[in-house]
């Protein structure tokens, strides 16, 4: 029985494999089959470039930025920043221990949601923040949304590579379902009722100027989460 303890997107390995395939005729065609297997094994065993702390910080940066792009204000950004950071840090630590993807996703999302609630409660008490800022609750779990597998699954299916496409699609739907159920369960247990975002009341020009760096931060954060080398950013 084949069992994969954990999986995910590793763009560092993807880039190396792409270079290997692209330069195979020129640089690797003289290798024996065993040598090629050994080379691929070395690529497969490459450790991640970034620690769990950096992965957590990257998730915090990305989710804090994207919650602003979705319409959230500074309370949502702060709470999402802290929640996503701790959630992805936990998920990364569990991944290093070879704990299954579904378990690490569920625990990571639960911690992210609980941290958002705790952080929001502190802001409520300290700064009398409106309860409507609960709307950013979903931002704390954005780090688990499998956008990469969703997109690549559609590309595979469009090329009639049904096996790869359906496998990736099933993986993406499973992760999304687990994250949604955990987020809903935590909100239900603590009687949390996120509503729509409060309007930011910013001018179109100021909103544009703020969205530009927020977009960069969001993409940069997710790039680090996907183990992309800084040389390729």
Give the residues covered by each predicted segment.
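Juxtamembrane helix-boundary/capping and inter-helix hinge elements in multi-pass membrane proteins
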Residues: 99, 130-131, 156-166
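Hydrophobic alpha-helical transmembrane segments in multi-pass integral membrane proteins
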Residues: 116-125, 181-191
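Oxyanion-binding "anion nests"
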Residues: 213-223
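Extended, low-hydrophobicity, polar/charged segments
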Residues: 156, 166-175, 187, 206-208, ...
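Soluble N-terminal domains of membrane-associated systems
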Residues: 1-38, 42
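Core alpha-helical transmembrane segments of integral membrane proteins
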Residues: 49-152, 221-227
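Membrane-interface helix termini and inter-helical loops of multi-pass transporters
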Residues: 124-132, 191-203
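Conserved small/polar residues in nucleotide/adenosyl-binding loops
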Residues: 231-233
């Amino acid at each position: 029985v084949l069992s994969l303890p954990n999986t995910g997107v590793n763009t560092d390995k993807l880039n190396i494999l792409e270079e290997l395939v692209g330069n195979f005729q020129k640089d690797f065609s003289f290798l024996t089959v065993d040598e090629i297997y050994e080379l691929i094994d070395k690529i497969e065993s490459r450790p991640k470039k970034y620690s769990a702390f950096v992965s957590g910080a990257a998730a915090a940066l990305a989710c804090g930025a994207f919650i602003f792009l979705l319409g959230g204000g500074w309370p949502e950004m702060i709470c999402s920043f802290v929640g996503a950071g701790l959630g992805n840090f936990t998920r990364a630590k569990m991944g290093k221990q070879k704990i299954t993807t579904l378990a690490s996703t569920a625990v990571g999302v639960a911690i992210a949601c609980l941290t958002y609630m705790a952080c929001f409660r502190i802001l409520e008490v300290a700064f009398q923040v409106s309860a409507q800022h609960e709307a950013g609750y979903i931002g704390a779990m954005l780090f688990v949304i499998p956008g990469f597998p969703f997109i690549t699954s559609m590309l595979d299916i469009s090329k009639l590579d049904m096996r790869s496409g359906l496998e990736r699609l099933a993986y993406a739907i499973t992760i999304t379902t687990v994250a949604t159920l955990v987020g809903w369960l935590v909100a239900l247990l603590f009687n949390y009722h996120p509503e729509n975002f409060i309007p930011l009341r910013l001018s179109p020009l100021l909103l544009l100027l703020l969205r530009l760096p927020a977009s960069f931060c969001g993409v940069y954060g997710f790039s680090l989460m996907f183990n992309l080398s800084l040389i390729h950013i």
